[in-house]
Amino acid sequence: SRGGTTFTRAYTPCPSCIAARRSLMTGMTPYSQGMIGYQDGKPWDYEHTLAGTLRDSGYQTVNVGKTHFDPPRLHLGFEQLTTSQDYGEWLARQQGLDGVEKFAHGVPANSWLARPNHLPEHQIEETWFTTQALDFLNHRDPTRPFFLCLSFNGPHPPWCPPQVFYDQFIDRSMPEPAV
């Protein structure tokens, strides 16, 4: 981080996650890249991407986490891609979790309901993504610069934190947001 950059006034170009990701990866405004709101299933067909430009400049390019790429396994310049699909496959192989899925907590994907996650913290998607990112950092090629895009689903509905965090805040009054 000594040679890194902090953006203290960075703002999303769009409040919708898919459109914002497209703008970040293409450098284009939502209007220019063709998505100004939430639209699933719209193909990503761009000649240039941030990851592709960095890869072509010699960077190791790795994405871990949520992508919203279409088709889902599209690399868009990333040499390595680890997604929610990989997490789902990993979760299905965990001992004692036959048939358990990440949404078995019963809260729909974009619901405003909240309840504790049914999985132990070490098996929750965000924990798994973090572990995968740390594994990359610990085993990457130290002779090459890198670009790691680590993208979590949370905070995003459904609101299903680990039990310990749910219990920590459930009965607490929250201050009004500063505007």
Residue ranges and their predicted role:
Residues 1-179:
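Formylglycine-dependent sulfatase
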